[in-house]
């Protein structure tokens, strides 16, 4: 077969593509040396036209072709979707196999708004997912194999120019803790093995090897329900190396939980928050405005209650406005006119009000689901709801002061601002029967957050033996800013600048002098245990612990 002759005489399309990529890199290097900013898309279009190419070179090809001596300079500029690792870690979402919702046994049906699952129109999808979200599609391609899902996603992020030294897993796909113990162990074992390259026979062995892996697992997040967040579940999750829970709350109203067929009470939510925080977990809740029989006023009221009532007060929130999807009970209500979604402008208004209520110690992880618009019959009409809500807040003169909005990495990407004068700020509050202290390094003038630490004086009811009898626990330590490989120090990035150590010293002082604790514990991701060993901590059960003299 003859090679495809391009318009430049004898070269094939592949050769022209190589010349285009080389030219793009050459121009990028020149622009860097002259200190100029370059619009990459314009540059690709112009260079492709110059060589008569029908298609532009892919970003992955350009990143792969950057010479070694320029990689440090150019790859950060070429990085696709820099937000992916702006918070300091690469997040890898994996899905467990499709299984039925556990509360079908005693409520007779799934939640009224819930799509997906083995009995739905989307039969190969997990419960509450349609199978068309990016994560679901990756999981289906890998046939829900945890090892393959992890390897493929890590490789993909690498090719896009991200540093994958630190990985955080999110285990999605319905109630993971409702699956059999054998399957759960197999799943978690494979996640750790995919990073360490070892083949383990048990979870404890996988965790041991994962501690020493080059790609560190800095945390695992598991999605669960309040009734699958009891003491035995929490202990299992600690043994997996899990550090954060995503608990489906959806509404703080008892009547709404009953009408939507949740299968648990609001009291169960408060109890699971209490137990989870006393075991050291970070608690992220899923909330759904616009559910049936609520209305705008009650929706606003429930978020005031949610952030101000000490029985709730989560560390993070995912805000999922209700969507009407074919095949759900809600779809039938909508079709017969018994349910109506808010209009787009009302929804933007409501989300703007909710974001204004968020306290500075809570992080809003997501606003709206990742479900493709063609599958949505009614509900959110915009793909960029958070941006629209933030713009509406600007008009109203309010601001969103949650953790994510103020992070140094995100501020740099969106507003090109860097912190100038950094100081330690302390906020104390009471939540779920314990005394919480939120320590952070911030630039108060520009309202930028560099690092944070969550410290808790455990309540008397803590069920873990390691945390009984006057123990303080560090539930989270995180320095923001783009991922910096663990072995290197980059003076322009904020990770590995010693902020973490300063925050830990202050936490130890508060635990000793104010809490009157005899020891301090840290719930640490498997891959970060060595960091705490350097600070004088040692492993006791699943926690890193240090005696306070």
Swiss-Prot record:
<dbReference type="InterPro" id="IPR007197">
    <property type="entry name" value="rSAM"/>
</dbReference>
<dbReference type="GO" id="GO:0008607">
    <property type="term" value="F:phosphorylase kinase regulator activity"/>
</dbReference>
<keyword id="KW-0411">Iron-sulfur</keyword>
<feature type="binding site">
    <location>
        <position position="166"/>
    </location>
    <ligand>
        <name>acetyl-CoA</name>
    </ligand>
</feature>
<dbReference type="InterPro" id="IPR006638">
    <property type="entry name" value="Elp3/MiaA/NifB-like_rSAM"/>
</dbReference>
<dbReference type="GO" id="GO:0000049">
    <property type="term" value="F:tRNA binding"/>
</dbReference>
<dbReference type="GO" id="GO:0046872">
    <property type="term" value="F:metal ion binding"/>
</dbReference>
<dbReference type="InterPro" id="IPR032432">
    <property type="entry name" value="Radical_SAM_C"/>
</dbReference>
<dbReference type="GO" id="GO:0005634">
    <property type="term" value="C:nucleus"/>
</dbReference>
<dbReference type="InterPro" id="IPR016181">
    <property type="entry name" value="Acyl_CoA_acyltransferase"/>
</dbReference>
<dbReference type="GO" id="GO:0005737">
    <property type="term" value="C:cytoplasm"/>
</dbReference>
<feature type="binding site">
    <location>
        <position position="532"/>
    </location>
    <ligand>
        <name>acetyl-CoA</name>
    </ligand>
</feature>
<dbReference type="Pfam" id="PF16199">
    <property type="entry name" value="Radical_SAM_C"/>
</dbReference>
<keyword id="KW-0479">Metal-binding</keyword>
<dbReference type="InterPro" id="IPR000182">
    <property type="entry name" value="GNAT_dom"/>
</dbReference>
<comment type="function">
    <text>Catalytic tRNA acetyltransferase subunit of the elongator complex which is required for multiple tRNA modifications, including mcm5U (5-methoxycarbonylmethyl uridine), mcm5s2U (5-methoxycarbonylmethyl-2-thiouridine), and ncm5U (5-carbamoylmethyl uridine). In the elongator complex, acts as a tRNA uridine(34) acetyltransferase by mediating formation of carboxymethyluridine in the wobble base at position 34 in tRNAs. Stabilizes transcriptional repressor snai1 by inhibiting its ubiquitination which promotes neural crest cell migration.</text>
</comment>
<dbReference type="GO" id="GO:0051539">
    <property type="term" value="F:4 iron, 4 sulfur cluster binding"/>
</dbReference>
<comment type="similarity">
    <text>Belongs to the ELP3 family.</text>
</comment>
<feature type="binding site">
    <location>
        <begin position="499"/>
        <end position="501"/>
    </location>
    <ligand>
        <name>acetyl-CoA</name>
    </ligand>
</feature>
<dbReference type="GO" id="GO:0050821">
    <property type="term" value="P:protein stabilization"/>
</dbReference>
<keyword id="KW-0408">Iron</keyword>
<keyword id="KW-0694">RNA-binding</keyword>
<keyword id="KW-0819">tRNA processing</keyword>
<dbReference type="Pfam" id="PF23613">
    <property type="entry name" value="ELP3_N"/>
</dbReference>
<feature type="binding site">
    <location>
        <position position="101"/>
    </location>
    <ligand>
        <name>[4Fe-4S] cluster</name>
    </ligand>
</feature>
<dbReference type="GO" id="GO:0106261">
    <property type="term" value="F:tRNA uridine(34) acetyltransferase activity"/>
</dbReference>
<dbReference type="InterPro" id="IPR039661">
    <property type="entry name" value="ELP3"/>
</dbReference>
<keyword id="KW-0820">tRNA-binding</keyword>
<dbReference type="GO" id="GO:0002098">
    <property type="term" value="P:tRNA wobble uridine modification"/>
</dbReference>
<keyword id="KW-0808">Transferase</keyword>
<comment type="pathway">
    <text>tRNA modification; 5-methoxycarbonylmethyl-2-thiouridine-tRNA biosynthesis.</text>
</comment>
<feature type="domain" description="N-acetyltransferase">
    <location>
        <begin position="398"/>
        <end position="549"/>
    </location>
</feature>
<dbReference type="GO" id="GO:0006357">
    <property type="term" value="P:regulation of transcription by RNA polymerase II"/>
</dbReference>
<protein>
    <recommendedName>
        <fullName>Elongator complex protein 3</fullName>
        <ecNumber>2.3.1.311</ecNumber>
    </recommendedName>
</protein>
<dbReference type="GO" id="GO:0001755">
    <property type="term" value="P:neural crest cell migration"/>
</dbReference>
<keyword id="KW-0963">Cytoplasm</keyword>
<feature type="domain" description="Radical SAM core">
    <location>
        <begin position="84"/>
        <end position="374"/>
    </location>
</feature>
<feature type="binding site">
    <location>
        <position position="111"/>
    </location>
    <ligand>
        <name>[4Fe-4S] cluster</name>
    </ligand>
</feature>
<dbReference type="InterPro" id="IPR034687">
    <property type="entry name" value="ELP3-like"/>
</dbReference>
<dbReference type="Pfam" id="PF04055">
    <property type="entry name" value="Radical_SAM"/>
</dbReference>
<feature type="binding site">
    <location>
        <position position="114"/>
    </location>
    <ligand>
        <name>[4Fe-4S] cluster</name>
    </ligand>
</feature>
<dbReference type="InterPro" id="IPR056591">
    <property type="entry name" value="ELP3-like_N"/>
</dbReference>
